[in-house]
């Protein structure tokens, strides 16, 4: 008999599989809350690994970005083509408190707006709100037929396009620089577009005027009080109950 390892004996029994642990058993569920500027605040749920050792679940949640349809947040199907980005800034209990992080159009809506025989006019403006948020707003507009127009094309001259773009820039700058981020999020969906349409009617009639995208370039230093106010909560919630300073008295007694 040859001296050595018997390979057949060392093999395990056939059919036995390694026991695998369900990855979801190590996770916790947190609720995502939208700011009080929106009609519906419950965005949904998010999963995160439980706090183990030095890995804190709250640190994993902070900074997460969620993309939600504005129709769901405002309970209005007319806003279904707008997508809002919300960023988690603070975690309280099992709730993730979010703040506005940006806005965008769905690709199908943008494609449906572009048509033949009209001029597309675009403009982008970088503005700073009163609460020190630096934003870049992208506007889109299309020319339309004048009343009683027979010609099928509605092409604007380059001088008219420049004049319209200047008006768009002025209106966005005026509206955004005099408001907070929360006030601006209410105006973006419809109000600014309608105002641009009225102001530029004398230059060339416009249709489908929208703020198609909002990009957050820079945020101010994080302020918990401001975030809680945005969510309609007081900053004094449970703070006094959690902090205990009993160890100080023991030190004084020993001295």
Swiss-Prot record:
Residues 19-28 have a biased composition (Basic and acidic residues). Pfam families: Ribosomal_S3Ae (PF01015). GO terms for cellular component: cytosolic small ribosomal subunit. Belongs to the eukaryotic ribosomal protein eS1 family. InterPro entries: Ribosomal_eS1, Ribosomal_eS1_CS, Ribosomal_eS1_euk. This is Small ribosomal subunit protein eS1. GO terms for biological process: translation. Residues 1-18 have a biased composition (Basic residues). It comes from the Eukaryota. The lineage of its organism: Eukaryota, Fungi, Dikarya, Ascomycota, Pezizomycotina. The keyword Ribosomal protein applies. Coiled coil: none annotated. The keyword Acetylation applies. Keywords: Acetylation, Cytoplasm, Ribonucleoprotein, Ribosomal protein. One of its GO terms (molecular function) is structural constituent of ribosome. It is found in: Cytoplasm. Component of the small ribosomal subunit. Mature ribosomes consist of a small (40S) and a large (60S) subunit. The 40S subunit contains about 33 different proteins and 1 molecule of RNA (18S). The 60S subunit contains about 49 different proteins and 3 molecules of RNA (25S, 5.8S and 5S). The modification N-acetylalanine is found at residue 2. It comes from Blastomyces gilchristii (strain SLH14081).
């Amino acid at each position: 008999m040859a001296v050595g390892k018997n390979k057949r004996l060392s093999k395990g029994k056939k059919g036995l599989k390694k026991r695998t642990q369900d990855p979801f058993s190590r996770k916790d569920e947190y609720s995502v809350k939208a700011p009080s500027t929106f009609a519906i605040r419950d965005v949904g749920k998010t999963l995160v690994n439980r706090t183990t050792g030095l890995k804190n679940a709250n640190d994993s949640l902070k900074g997460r970005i969620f993309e939600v349809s504005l129709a769901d947040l405002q309970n209005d199907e007319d806003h279904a083509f707008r997508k809002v980005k919300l960023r988690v800034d603070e975690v309280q209990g099992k709730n993730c408190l979010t703040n506005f992080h940006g806005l965008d159009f769905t690709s199908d809506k943008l494609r449906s707006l572009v048509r033949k025989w009209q001029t597309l006019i675009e403009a982008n403006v970088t503005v700073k709100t009163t609460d020190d948020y630096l934003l870049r707003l992208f506007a889109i507009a299309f020319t339309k037929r004048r009343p009683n127009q027979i010609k099928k094309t509605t092409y604007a001259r380059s001088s008219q396009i420049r004049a319209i773009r200047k008006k768009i820039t002025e209106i966005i700058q005026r509206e955004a620089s005099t408001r907070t981020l929360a006030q601006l999020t209410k105006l973006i969906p419809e109000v600014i577009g309608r105002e641009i349409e009225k102001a530029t009617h004398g230059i060339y009639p416009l249709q489908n005027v929208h703020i198609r995208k909002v990009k957050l370039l820079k945020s101010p230093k994080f302020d918990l009080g401001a975030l809680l106010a945005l969510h309609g909560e007081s900053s004094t919630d449970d703070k006094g109950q959690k902090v205990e300073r009993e160890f100080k008295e023991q030190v004084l007694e020993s001295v």
